[in-house]
Each structure stands twice: as C-alpha cells, then as structure tokens.
C-alpha cells in the first residue's frame, strides 16, 4: 500500500503530510506555528488524514475546527486545509458513530453513521492479549 496518494492539488495520507503513516496531528498542534508551517508546506491545497480519529479541519492561521461545530458543507476553496476525516471504526471524539467525509472539490461534508460498536467491543474482549479498555472505550467514543 502506498504511504500517500495525490489527485491534483489534494493529498491523502493516513497520518500527517510530513510522516504519512505515523505522525499525529492533534488539535493543539495549531498552537505550534513551526510545526503547522512545516505541515502546510507539504500540501498544495487540501490534505486528508485521520490518524488521531478526531474529525475536524486544520487551517494555516486559525485554531482547529471540530467536526461537531461544522453544519453542512464547509467550503475549502481559499487557503490551505488539512481535514481529519475521523474514524470509521474507533471514533475518539465522544461520538460512537463512524465518521467520514464527502469531498466534491470545493466543500467538505462530514457524515456520521451508526455501526455496531458493541459487536466490535465483544471481539476485542475475546482477544486475551488486548486490554479490555480497548473494547470498553468504543461505548464512549474514546
């Protein structure tokens, strides 16, 4: 599997434009100007990732905008943006539903859908080498 993908001026990564597979870009990163400048130098216009499982949008010069504060399609036409799409299976923002986005080239629309986290939690608990907390947190969306 490739570490990243591009389509025109859009970059797709799992984690960060700097380290596409491992680096966390947490909401508080927006208060570290050097870090954010380095990240935004790596993208042309829009980047999508989700390593932290915290859906929302990063801007070059503003604080992180959490998904739950965005109503309807959000325009991504002026400036650069990093969109964290959240998580399809293990959300960490207090909402147990899966999170994904629809991108039409001009706007990002965050969507949520129910999934059977109880079934997933049971499967996790059956794996003896995994801590029970990994399954229990699914019920809290954490």
Identify the meaning behind each predicted range.
Residues 62-142:
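Acidic, His/Gly-rich catalytic cores of divalent-metal-dependent hydrolytic chemistry
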Residues 1-48, 52-66:
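Conserved catalytic scaffold of divalent metal-dependent phosphoesterases
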């Amino acid at each position: 599997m490739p570490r990243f993908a591009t389509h025109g001026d859009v970059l797709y990564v799992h984690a960060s434009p700097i380290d596409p597979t491992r680096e966390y870009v947490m909401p508080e990163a927006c208060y570290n100007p050097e870090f954010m400048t380095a990240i935004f130098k790596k993208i042309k216009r829009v980047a999508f990732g989700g390593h932290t499982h915290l859906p929302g949008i990063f801007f070059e010069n503003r604080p992180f905008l959490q998904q739950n504060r965005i109503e309807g399609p959000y325009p991504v036409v002026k400036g650069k943006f990093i969109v964290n799409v959240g998580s399809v299976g293990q959300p960490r923002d207090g909402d147990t539903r899966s999170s994904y986005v629809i991108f039409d080239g001009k706007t990002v629309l965050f969507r949520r859908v129910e999934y059977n986290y109880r079934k997933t939690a049971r499967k996790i608990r059956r794996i003896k080498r995994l801590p029970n907390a990994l399954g229990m947190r699914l019920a809290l969306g954490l």
